[in-house]
Design a protein with these regions (language model features):
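Short alpha-helical "packing" element that flanks the helix-turn-helix/winged-helix DNA-binding module
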Residues: 14-21, 60
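Hydrophobic alpha-helix position signal
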Residues: 4-5, 20, 49
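Recognition helix of helix-turn-helix DNA-binding domains
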Residues: 24-59
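A generic structural signal for short
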Residues: 6, 14-16, 33
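Short helix-to-turn junction characteristic of helix-turn-helix DNA-binding domains
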Residues: 21-25, 64
Length: 65
């Protein structure tokens, strides 16, 4: 995940969210784990998708490969 973070210039929070996605966490679980709202989680996910150039979690997971 660290090389992925550097390659796509993800923030520390975006990297945390990416790690939780890899573990299979949903938006509610991510929000609870990080002490943020579900809406904030969705905003971070949108930024991650934009930076990586994907439209879905499955595409993100495929890029993380």
């Amino acid at each position: 995940v660290h090389a992925f973070r550097r390659r796509y210039r993800l923030s520390a929070r975006e990297s945390q969210i990416t790690e939780l996605i890899l573990r299979g966490s949903g938006n509610r679980e991510i929000a609870q784990a990080l002490g943020i709202t579900v809406m904030t989680t969705k905003k971070h996910l949108g930024r991650i998708f934009d930076k990586v150039g994907v439209d879905s979690r499955s595409q993100l997971m495929a890029k993380l490969g």
